[in-house]
Structure formats: C-alpha cells, structure tokens
A protein has these predicted regions:
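Active-site-proximal segments of metal-dependent phosphoesterases and phosphodiesterases across multiple
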Residues: 110-147
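Histidine/acidic-residue-rich catalytic or RNA/ligand-binding cores of hydrolases
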Residues: 70-74, 113-122, 146-152, 169-186
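A metal-dependent hydrolase metal-coordination microenvironment
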Residues: 1-102, 106, 131, 138-168
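Catalytic-core segments of hydrolase enzymes
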Residues: 57-58, 137, 180, 185
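Homeobox/homeodomain signature
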Residues: 11, 48, 123-126, 174-176
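A structural motif
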Residues: 124-128, 158, 171
C-alpha cells in the first residue's frame, strides 16, 4: 500500500545510514489492487538488487492485516509471503510460524483499531501461547504505546520501533530539524 517504488525505500534507508530494512506490504489490504498484481513477494524481489548494491540487508516480510482482534502483525524473515494469504487469520499465523518468521504485533494503540483504549485480547493470548507472537511494536512514528512496553516485559517479548511509512520519508520527517524515523536497534 506504499506510495513509492520499493527501490526508493532502499535508497532512503541507505541515505539514513540504516543497515537493514523490511518492506512489509499488507497481505489483505490492497488499495492499489487494480494496478498491481498480487504477488506478495514482488516488493522484495524488485528491491533485492539495489539493496545488495548498497550493502543493505533486505529482510523479506509481510503484514497480516486483520481487524481487531487480533489486529495488524508483521511477519519478517519469511521464505515466501504468498502462502500468508489465508481466509482464517490463524492459518496465516501458522504459515508464518511454519516458515520460521519473527512475528510481532503492530501499533496495538492505533486509534483506528482500538479507539478507546489499548487492550490485550484473548486472541493475543492464544497467538502468544501458540508461539505466533515474538514481539510488539511499542513505537510507530509519533505513536508511543506504554502498555505494550509492560506486555513485553511481562511476557519476555521483543520491543520494536518502526516507521510504517507509506509516502516518501521526507513527507513525515524534517531532517533539517533533526527528525528521523522510528527504528529498532539490534
């Protein structure tokens, strides 16, 4: 659902000094489906050559995009994103798990999905117990979710910070003022 070509994301990452990037296109939400073929690996394939040229580690990933609960999750370190397109969300998660993906819950405090509060649902407990949740996004652009930090501490989950950018990066961040994307240090 991004508004820039995948190689542009790699170029942006290089200019910002990042070592790795994952382009996690939505599996279920495809606002440009009339114009773009639904091969969920295509963004990765298009940007591989540029990433290699610039020395950027490109991580194959996709976003499992469901209503709450369970919400939106990224699965990274996939072998093939296409099998994640499943009717039942549990089947999509099990496919990601089968591929050895690292799966994390995106923006649990996003007002579009949880307008009144940030809640941990029974579906999240099930995903966690099934080994289908390894982390939680605690920061997403300007969105900060303190509840998610506590859940990570309580459940020994990885804390993630991401940019979740859909348009050119300079649209969201003013580099001349020292602003930068949210990121995870590894």
């Amino acid at each position: 659902d991004g508004l820039v070509w995948p190689t542009v994301r790699v170029d942006e990452a290089y200019r910002e000094g990042l070592d790795a990037i994952s382009l996690t296109e939505h599996i279920e939400y495809r606002p440009h489906k009339k114009d773009i073929i639904a091969d969920h690996n295509r963004s990765y394939e298009l940007s591989q050559k540029q990433a290699k040229k610039l020395g950027i580690l490109l991580i194959r990933g996709s976003e499992i995009t469901r209503s709450m609960p369970p919400g939106h999750f990224n699965a990274i370190f996939l072998n093939d994103s296409n099998p994640l397109e499943q009717k039942a969300y549990k089947d999509a998660f099990n496919e990601a798990k089968k591929q050895g993906a690292f799966i994390f819950w995106n923006h649990p405090g996003w007002a579009r999905q949880q307008p009144d509060s940030t809640l941990w649902w029974p579906e999240h407990t099930q995903l966690y117990n099934d080994g289908c949740m390894h982390g939680i996004e605690v920061a997403n652009g300007g969105l900060f979710m303190p509840e998610a930090i506590q859940w990570c501490l309580d459940k020994n989950l990885t804390m993630i910070g991401t940019s979740d950018i859909h348009q050119p990066i300079q649209t969201d961040y003013d580099f001349s003022k020292g602003e930068h994307r949210t990121m995870t240090f590894v």
